[in-house]
């Protein structure tokens, strides 16, 4: 009889060289801290009903996204056991997926963006440029932190997004579609060019030790939070700059959802429609009935 732990360890070992560091950390934490209560069980003795009960109890502690991660791990572990003929049925097949309700985005208004950028002039040039890149390119914060001068082509007015930084270091961006080109708009061009001229290190954003930042923690704690507080603007994460860019470029230009999905580095238009187009539609006035259809 094979134990659950045997296949759980195999799952981690197989993924060790395939996953990004962040994914590896997440799955290791789930297997060792959440699923370890199954370790000594014979894998064929684990039933769908008891897993369903466990997930029901977990709903009181964690959200749907985390539950989906738990389910994904279990599914892959049981699938390995099925491949090895240790079980004939994967109990996860009998569990329904958890409905994921994403919180509604709250982008900044046009006037708030102007006020924020103006007020940021009291802070470092580094922080000012971080905000301008966020608001004028829609790049993810990790992608901005990984940006090097060699990734910027001022002649073609393009930024080449190739890497992203996080607490796990520097890696390829979120998806294959995230490796992309982002246009440098007029409002950003001169400021970015000037900033690069007086940046003597390849990375655009480095700390006092001349090393690139891994997270936006310092910007958030020492600049972003105090800035919003001083302006009486409700706090939102720096990542909301990306949502602000997306909603405003959809509202104010002729860009299509497909083109926007490519600018943002999404693998499909689904996110653009579900998040940004839907948000804009909800902001519109009541449907005008005096229009001429034909």
What are these regions (language model features)?
Residues 44, 87-89, 100-118, 168-185, ...:
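DNA breakage-rejoining catalytic core of tyrosine-based enzymes
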Residues 21, 103, 165, 264-289:
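Catalytic-site neighborhood detector that most strongly recognizes the C-terminal catalytic loop/helix
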Residues 146-194:
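Conserved tyrosine-mediated DNA breakage-rejoining catalytic core shared by Y-recombinases
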Residues 115-119, 170-172, 180, 274-294:
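DNA/chromatin major-groove-contacting recognition/catalytic segments
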Residues 185-234:
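Active-site/catalytic core of tyrosine-dependent DNA strand-transfer enzymes
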Residues 83, 132, 136, 142-143, ...:
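C-terminal catalytic core of tyrosine-transesterase DNA break-rejoin enzymes
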Residues 68, 83, 87, 94-141, ...:
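Basic, Lys/Arg- and aromatic-enriched nucleic-acid-binding interface segment
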Residues 2-8, 12-79, 84-86, 102, ...:
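N-terminal core-binding DNA-recognition domain of tyrosine site-specific recombinases/integrases
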């Amino acid at each position: 009889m094979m134990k659950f732990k045997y296949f759980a360890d195999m799952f981690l070992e197989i993924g060790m060289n395939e996953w990004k560091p962040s994914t590896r950390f997440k799955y290791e934490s789930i297997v060792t801290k959440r699923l370890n209560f199954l370790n000594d069980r014979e894998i064929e003795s684990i039933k769908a009903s008891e897993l369903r009960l466990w997930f029901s109890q977990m709903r009181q502690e964690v959200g749907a996204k985390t539950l989906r991660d738990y389910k994904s791990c279990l599914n892959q572990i049981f699938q390995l056991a099925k491949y090895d003929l240790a079980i004939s049925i994967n109990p996860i097949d009998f569990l329904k997926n958890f409905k994921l309700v994403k919180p509604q985005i709250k982008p900044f208004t046009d006037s708030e963006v102007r006020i924020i950028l103006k007020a940021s002039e009291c802070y470092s040039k580094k922080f000012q440029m971080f905000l301008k890149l966020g608001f004028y390119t829609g790049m993810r914060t990790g992608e901005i932190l990984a940006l090097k001068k060699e990734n910027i082509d001022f002649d073609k007015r393009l930024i080449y997004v190739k890497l992203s930084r996080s607490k796990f270091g520097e890696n390829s961006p979120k998806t294959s579609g995230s490796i992309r080109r982002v246009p440098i708009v007029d409002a950003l061009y001169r400021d970015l060019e000037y900033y690069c001229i007086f940046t003597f290190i390849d990375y655009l954003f480095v700390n006092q030790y001349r090393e690139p930042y891994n997270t936006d923690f310092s910007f958030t704690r020492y600049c972003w939070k105090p800035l919003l507080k001083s302006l009486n603007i409700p706090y939102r994460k720096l990542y909301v700059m990306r949502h602000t860019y997306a909603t405003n470029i959809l509202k104010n230009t002729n860009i299509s959802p497909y083109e926007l999905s490519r600018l943002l580095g999404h693998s499909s238009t689904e996110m653009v429609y579900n998040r940004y187009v839907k948000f804009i539609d909800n902001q519109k006035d009541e449907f005008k009935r005096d229009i001429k259809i034909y």
